[in-house]
């Protein structure tokens, strides 16, 4: 969302504009233009939206554009070539963005395509933390950063004559959250999210593409005045890092998307372009002014040379990296004005006392004006009354030079100590356009006296400067310069069609897979879905089939399902209860583009992967269906839209819906408001075990495991929950199984950002190709402990804090690098790290990617298990649990009368009669078949008894059906036992295996987004792994691991003996080797994304 005005045609534009939240995700984002605050929002604006709009009509062209041949800069070099900008592609967008976003907070991404401004995306990292806080020190005399900042505040009041009250809450005493502009640091709280310069830059680019022919090109614009990218790979901010510190390894790239800045030097690769002040100046002549400053640059410099005062003049602030007269050239210039006022009228008009960081000082410095006093301002018109104008830079070039060149005065240009240049600097010639002055001002008085003695020469230089101003600094020249620069850059892009973004590819494959699951025809809803006495996988699976068969994709969902209450509503999502066949389920709907993608992903991983986990673990949510709604049926009030409309919404977009089971219970956030310490730890242990199981079976990472993304089901009585997670050679049962007795079943919800491995291929959104085993635990602990700290502070003064809060401190010390000793320590630690984007790496222990972090955490928590008498620990796996037959449940649900319902029960044994029994030559496979058939028969058999009694079924009919079940049960038991008993255990061979594993591990390939975004990298990769394309694909090992888990937990007549279990676990050991499985997944993912014609694996 943005305001109606990008600029104003009246100087009254400085009338206070109401602050409107233009980014619905961040309250303090009140910029004029929608500014993205995180990586996800950037991806939506720069990749997803252009992808969805690529078939749209191009914007109409209003007039004939000027070709490059007519450009006044066509024979001039507007930038020095650099190999980092040669042979580049769209693959450089992401690494360049990461560099600017993570290290410098803000910038603008621009894409020009088809002669129009396709993308103009300002960005500012909302939860910014720097990587240089450890280099910041203060003089020990201050004692703390807060005291230092108060001293700065007091000095600012003193020197500027203000009386602002000191408010410690308005500054941030933690330097990790500061940001810098090389030597100048910002530390206000909250950090200012301004929109300065953005309106001018966008206006300039819009007029450029309207009036000039511009080739397709992509680039970034630096919103700061200090350049960002060095040519030699060292840190840009030399005053923080020094002169020779290389950038961190993750930001050392061979190729970059061009970064355009307002200032540069030979050290930097930034390309200088016309400044926002240049554009404001030329547009103010047209009566156009830009917020928020709305400065009027229209001046009439009418003073003749003979009427001008024969003195030099300077007015300005004390900006610059120095902090006193010895190292700040502007302060030194002001002092010289007091020494020879007959030659020089120089002074500081306001004191810029922002804290400075300098490579020449070990401590932060507060500028010290000494004995200087502020002087009156002089307008540009008043300054033009002087014959000589001293131009001196601040911490970079001073942008005012373009205006000063038009004042018809002689410029005394102080040479840049660091070689700073603006877009036209190389065209200015000493003694032609200006009089050069040494950087240290040592010859300033001599230059002024020379100017007085050589009036005619200075008048000629003033005239040359003015003519340069008219020919090279007007609007046409600005547009010419941009045209020439951008068209030169466009030629550096390779002609190859850039690869499709891997997340977009994944989105399309997920959509295809879900479409293939849709039934060929739907059935009319005829009755009630059979209620389940308790939550179980078989019943949920049956309701999934019931939902998909009952909901016609061509019809509005509300025409079949009955809507209930809305249980959640935000700016992007609406969650509503629906009832179908007497059973409640949840429908999450959205029209937000990113949420639609996340819902698609959630539907895919739910139906393909996570639904299976519910069979073994009650802590995952079952997904029934995903659909794109056929009609636009929502209204604005259906969402918490922002006043004035929001960029989140497009009224022509249809909603997307994901349907999931309804868990009746509070969120973990609400649960933590009143729960006991014991119940909290029970919930925590249950979630840890669920994560262990998900990681082992399918590489699950939730990526947003916060208290509001967990619903706690409260049971009437405690129950024992088992988590059999992996083989354990030290266990007598050969498998590691955790058990907990509890009334609280926490269920994870909202999988839109989650990662899984499906058929040996990575699928994810937040981190598409990586499994981070510690991330969910870290997020869960920090966020839940933060809720405890909020509860603690709310209770202060009302009751005596429980001594058990110390156990929370003990819990946090598993993650914290520094020992936390008190609740106060814990509160500070959680406050600083409660948001993932601001978590400081120095605050957290570093765990190897494949380390058993959660198991180590559970060991760490063992003393609290004993203290609170929690029934939790390792044990032997027992029954797999009661799981209904999904096919029988669906048949029962669509039955029209009691006869059809009875037939739904009897068809279970009859289907086994009618179909040939599966056979196997391997003892493990044969045992698995027998287990599955027996469980699929016995569970419905027991369920039939309850149903027959509730329906008062005729006794003879009931006995007849029971006998069919009984006969089939005996037949299956005898048939398979006779075969299994004669078999000798033989290794189960799963091709390709095991020799392929050794070669595989040696490849050490890892899929990354940057790998798939670069045509060159893809070509090299295809050559390197070419033999693998012809090799057989690895089988779906997740299915085999699930099969083994089913068998280990089975306690029926075909239960594995300990010897047989030990034999096959040793035989199938590679299936549970994390290094091997990681290598398999990485290779299969790379093959999947790099094959010339990628086929869907569904």
From Swiss-Prot:
InterPro entries, A to Z: CAP10, Kinase-like_dom_sf, O-Glucosyltr/Glycosyltrsf_90
Q: Which Pfam families match?
A: Glyco_transf_90
Cysteines engaged in disulfide bonds, as pairs: none
Name of this chain's protein? Uncharacterized protein 035R
Classification from the root reads: Viruses, Varidnaviria, Bamfordvirae, Nucleocytoviricota, Megaviricetes
């Amino acid at each position: 969302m943005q305001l109606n005005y990008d600029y104003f045609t009246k100087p009254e534009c400085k009338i206070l504009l109401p602050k409107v939240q233009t980014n619905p995700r961040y309250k303090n984002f009140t910029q004029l233009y929608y500014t993205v605050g995180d990586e996800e929002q950037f991806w939506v604006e720069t990749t997803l939206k252009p992808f969805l709009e690529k078939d749209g009509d191009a914007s109409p062209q209003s007039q004939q554009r000027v070709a490059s041949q007519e450009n006044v800069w066509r024979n001039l070099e507007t930038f020095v070539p650099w190999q980092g900008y040669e042979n580049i592609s769209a693959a450089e967008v992401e690494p360049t963005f990461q560099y600017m976003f993570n290290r410098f907070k803000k910038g603008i991404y621009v894409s020009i395509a088809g002669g129009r401004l396709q993308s103009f995306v300002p960005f500012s990292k909302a939860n910014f933390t720097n990587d240089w806080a450890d280099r910041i020190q203060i003089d020990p005399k201050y004692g703390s950063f807060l005291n230092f900042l108060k001293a700065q505040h007091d000095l600012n009041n003193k020197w500027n004559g203000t009386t602002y009250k000191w408010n410690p809450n308005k500054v941030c005493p933690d330097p990790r959250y500061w940001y810098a502009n090389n030597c100048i640091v910002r530390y206000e709280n909250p950090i200012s999210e301004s929109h300065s310069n953005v309106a001018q830059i966008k206006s300039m680019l819009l007029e450029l593409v309207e009036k000039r022919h511009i080739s397709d090109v992509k680039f970034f614009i630096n919103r700061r005045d200090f350049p960002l990218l060095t040519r030699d790979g060292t840190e840009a901010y030399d005053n923080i890092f020094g002169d020779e510190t290389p950038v961190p390894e993750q930001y050392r790239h061979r190729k970059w998307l061009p970064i355009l800045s307002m200032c540069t030097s030979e050290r930097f690769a930034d390309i200088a372009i016309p400044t926002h002040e240049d554009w404001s100046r030329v547009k103010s002549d047209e009566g156009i002014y830009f917020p928020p400053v709305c400065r009027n640059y229209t001046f009439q410099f009418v003073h003749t040379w003979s009427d001008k005062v024969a003195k030099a003049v300077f007015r300005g602030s004390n900006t610059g990296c120095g902090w006193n007269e010895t190292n700040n050239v502007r302060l030194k210039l002001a002092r010289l004005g007091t020494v020879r006022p007959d030659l020089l009228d120089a002074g500081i008009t306001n004191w810029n006392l922002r804290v400075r960081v300098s490579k020449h000082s070990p401590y932060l410095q507060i500028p010290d004006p000494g004995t200087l006093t502020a002087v009156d301002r002089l307008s540009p018109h008043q300054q033009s009354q002087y014959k000589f104008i001293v131009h001196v830079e601040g911490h970079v070039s001073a942008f005012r030079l373009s205006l000063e060149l038009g004042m018809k005065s002689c410029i005394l240009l102080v040479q840049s100590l660091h070689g700073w240049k603006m877009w036209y600097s190389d065209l200015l010639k000493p003694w032609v356009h200006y009089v050069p002055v040494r950087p240290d001002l040592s010859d300033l008085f001599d230059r002024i006296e020379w100017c007085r003695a050589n009036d005619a020469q200075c008048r000629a230089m003033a005239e040359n400067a003015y003519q340069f101003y008219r020919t090279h600094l007007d609007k046409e020249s600005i547009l010419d310069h941009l045209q020439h620069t951008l068209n030169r850059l466009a030629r550096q892009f390779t002609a190859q069609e850039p690869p499709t973004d891997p997340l977009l590819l994944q989105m399309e494959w997920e959509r295809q897979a879900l479409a293939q699951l849709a039934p060929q025809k739907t059935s009319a809803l005829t009755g009630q879905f059979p209620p389940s006495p308790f939550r179980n996988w078989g019943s949920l699976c049956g309701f999934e089939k019931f939902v998909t068969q009952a909901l016609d994709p061509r019809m509005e969902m509300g025409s079949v399902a009955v809507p209930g209450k809305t249980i959640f509503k935000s700016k992007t999502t609406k969650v509503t209860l629906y009832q179908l066949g007497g059973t409640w389920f949840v429908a999450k709907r959205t029209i937000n583009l990113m949420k639609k993608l996340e819902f698609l992903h959630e539907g895919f991983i739910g139906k393909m992967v996570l639904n299976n986990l519910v069979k073994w673990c009650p802590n995952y949510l079952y997904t029934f269906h995903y659909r794109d709604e056929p009609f636009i049926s929502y209204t604005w009030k259906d969402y918490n839209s922002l006043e004035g409309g929001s960029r989140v919404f497009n009224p022509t977009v249809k909603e997307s819906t994901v349907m999931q089971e309804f868990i009746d219970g509070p969120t973990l956030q609400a649960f933590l408001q009143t729960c006991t310490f014991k119940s909290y730890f029970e919930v925590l242990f249950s979630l840890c075990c669920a994560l262990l199981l998900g990681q082992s079976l399918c590489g699950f990472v939730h990526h947003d495991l916060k208290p509001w993304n967990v619903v706690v089901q409260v049971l009437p009585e405690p129950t024992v929950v088992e988590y059999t997670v992996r083989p354990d050679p030290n266990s007598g049962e050969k498998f590691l199984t955790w058990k907990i007795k509890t009334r609280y079943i926490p269920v994870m919800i909202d999988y839109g950002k989650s990662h899984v491995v499906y058929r040996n291929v990575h699928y994810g959104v937040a981190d598409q190709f990586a499994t981070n085993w510690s991330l969910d635990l870290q997020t869960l602990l920090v966020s839940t402990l933060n809720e405890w700290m909020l509860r603690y502070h709310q209770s202060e003064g009302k009751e005596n804090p429980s001594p058990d809060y110390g156990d929370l401190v003990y819990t946090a010390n598993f993650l914290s690098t520094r020992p936390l000793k008190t609740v106060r320590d814990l509160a500070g630690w959680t406050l600083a790290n409660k948001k993932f984007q601001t978590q400081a790496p120095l605050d957290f222990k570093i765990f190897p990617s494949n380390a058993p972090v959660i198991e180590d955490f559970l060991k760490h928590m063992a003393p609290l298990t004993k203290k609170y008498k929690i029934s939790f620990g390792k044990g032997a796996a027992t029954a797999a649990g009661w799981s209904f037959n999904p096919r029988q449940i669906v048949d029962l649900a669509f039955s029209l009368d009691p006869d059809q319902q009875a037939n739904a029960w009897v068809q279970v044994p009859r289907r086994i009669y009618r179909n040939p029994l599966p056979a196997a030559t391997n003892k493990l496979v044969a045992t698995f078949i027998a287990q599955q058939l027996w469980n699929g028969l016995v569970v419905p058999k027991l369920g039939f008894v309850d149903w027959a009694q509730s329906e008062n079924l005729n006794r003879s009919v009931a006995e007849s059906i029971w006998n069919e079940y009984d006969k089939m049960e005996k037949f299956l038991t005898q048939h398979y036992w006779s075969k299994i008993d004669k078999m000798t255990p033989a290794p189960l061979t799963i091709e390709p295996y095991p020799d392929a594993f050794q070669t595989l591990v040696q490849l050490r390939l890892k899929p990354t987004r940057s790998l798939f975004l670069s045509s060159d990298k893809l070509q090299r990769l295809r050559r390197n792994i070419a033999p693998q394309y012809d090799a057989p694909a690895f089988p779906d090992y997740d299915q085999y691991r699930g099969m083994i888990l089913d068998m280990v937990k089975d306690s029926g007549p075909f239960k594995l003996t300990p010897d047989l279990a030990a034999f096959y676990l040793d035989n199938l050991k590679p299936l549970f080797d994390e290094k091997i499985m990681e290598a398999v997944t990485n290779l299969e993912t790379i093959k999947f994304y790099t094959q010339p014609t990628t086929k869907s694996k569904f």
